[in-house]
Amino acid sequence: MTAILERRESASLWGRFCNWITSTENRLYIGWFGVLMIPTLLTATSVFIIAFIAAPPVDIDGIREPVSGSLLYGNNIISGAIIPTSAAIGLHFYPIWEAASVDEWLYNGGPYELIVLHFLLGVACYMGREWELSFRLGMRPWIAVAYSAPVAAATAVFLIYPIGQGSFSDGMPLGISGTFNFMIVFQAEHNILMHPFHMLGVAGVFGGSLFSAMHGSLVTSSLIRETTENESANEGYRFGQEEETYNIVAAHGYFGRLIFQYASFNNSRSLHFFLAAWPVVGIWFTALGISTMAFNLNGFNFNQSVVDSQGRVINTWADIINRANLGMEVMHERNAHNFPLDLAAVEAPSTNG
């Protein structure tokens, strides 16, 4: 009889825990995805802060030339970064216990792999938590779908690209200057500016910014007057009010006359779906582009594609970009190889002396 009571009490304890985890009454919703999200993101954040401040230099290229990335080793906020795991490690799983010592683990850039893998797991769980909370509240699932765009982008630069290139050392460094370095090298090696998926991503980000500014300014310009000239217009809105706070007919009429009638939405729901879908689809395409270029399916190559009747090359902007790419490729990892792959692939002319 005692054993039965103990089992019921433990089941009740587990039940209370489940109810607390899935309760929508908590100040912050936890959820089952949150059970995994919280420790992974806390780990990634903690290690990032410590490594950004105090990590020793990392042998990123695997040639015994460590690169400094932390504040205590001479960097500032702009130049500092978490240096990617060494090329000597490649794609190997490299937890602390796989190294001979903590010093070796730090020298080979172990913190980068730890941070990136925990971070990707954490943001994926955050996306799942968004869906979970929407489900519990009876909402539609589009918040999590929208968040999938930045999750896909982060996964592309931190995981898919290193897998395609064969080493975590090719992943994006975790810092401001490191991000710029990654972008420049990516352009040099993959000609991303000439990739149509990147172009769609640019249209998504810039177009999304434009549409957001247009929508916000139209709404703000067509607010229904509820206040005097001496009060803030924001005082005319009360949270939860049933009445519209702006005149969508006036906004529609203004924009329809500014451009043309059918350029303006007359349905608030389809308008807001469009505002969400445009940047999300654009960023999806960019992430897909990064993932294809990871395996060297690169941007368009129009180098020396225009010639005159004598066969002489007429340079276009594509040739200017190509020259810039070669210059950037020559400069990066300059001690790891003598020539960039484009130049080294050409057989050297023989000299008969």
From Swiss-Prot:
**GO annotation, cellular component aspect:** chloroplast thylakoid membrane; photosystem II
Pfam families reported for this sequence:
Photo_RC
Binding positions (chlorophyll a PD1): H198
**Record site feature (Tyrosine radical intermediate), residues:** Y161
The UniProt entry, under InterPro entries, shows:
D1/D2, Photo_II_D1/D2_sf, Photo_RC_L/M, Photo_RC_L/M_CS, PSII_D1
**Subunit structure as annotated in this protein's UniProt entry:** PSII is composed of 1 copy each of membrane proteins PsbA, PsbB, PsbC, PsbD, PsbE, PsbF, PsbH, PsbI, PsbJ, PsbK, PsbL, PsbM, PsbT, PsbX, PsbY, PsbZ, Psb30/Ycf12, at least 3 peripheral proteins of the oxygen-evolving complex and a large number of cofactors. It forms dimeric complexes.
State the protein's name. Photosystem II protein D1
Gene source species? Ceratophyllum demersum (Rigid hornwort)
